[in-house]
A protein has these predicted regions:
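Local sequence-structure signature of Cys/Sec-based thiol-disulfide redox active-site neighborhoods
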Residues: 3-44
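Short, contiguous strand/loop micro-motifs
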Residues: 18-20, 46, 50, 78
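Loop/helix-junction capping segments adjacent to catalytic residues or to phosphate/diphosphate-binding pockets
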Residues: 26-29, 53, 84-85
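Conserved strand-to-helix beginnings and helix N-cap segments that scaffold or border functional pockets
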Residues: 30-33, 56-57, 88
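Thioredoxin-like thiol-disulfide oxidoreductase module
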Residues: 48-69
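Short, basic, helix/turn surface patches
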Residues: 64-81
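Non-catalytic, surface beta->alpha helical segment in thiol-disulfide oxidoreductase systems
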Residues: 77-96
């Protein structure tokens, strides 16, 4: 796959590598994004439904590594853990 995923970056406190894969129309994705902003952490995110071609394929391939059902939101933390769906308690515990 030659496509590159162009992530958006949200500035904040560095709590490790945090990547949010979301859909622009997803309420739970918006809640997850809002929680990350409330926590004041730096994170990267992408709205997968706004991607096309190789970039979309690459994003879906990456999500499936962590979440075979490819559901949203998928929040990957430090390339070692994935929280699927909006789970405020798990997100707060994982980010500290």
């Amino acid at each position: 796959m030659g496509g590159k995923i162009d992530m958006e970056h949200n500035e904040g406190i560095n709590k490790g590598q945090i990547t949010l894969y979301a859909l622009s129309t997803c309420v739970w994705c918006k809640k997850t994004k809002s929680l990350l902003e409330d926590l004041g952490v730096a994170y990267d995110y992408v709205y997968v439904d706004n991607l096309f071609g190789d970039a979309r394929d690459k994003a879906l391939e990456e999500i499936k590594r962590w979440n075979p059902r490819c559901s949203f939101p998928s929040l990957v933390i430090d390339n070692s853990r994935c929280i699927v769906g909006f789970d405020e308690k798990k997100i707060r515990e994982a980010i500290g």
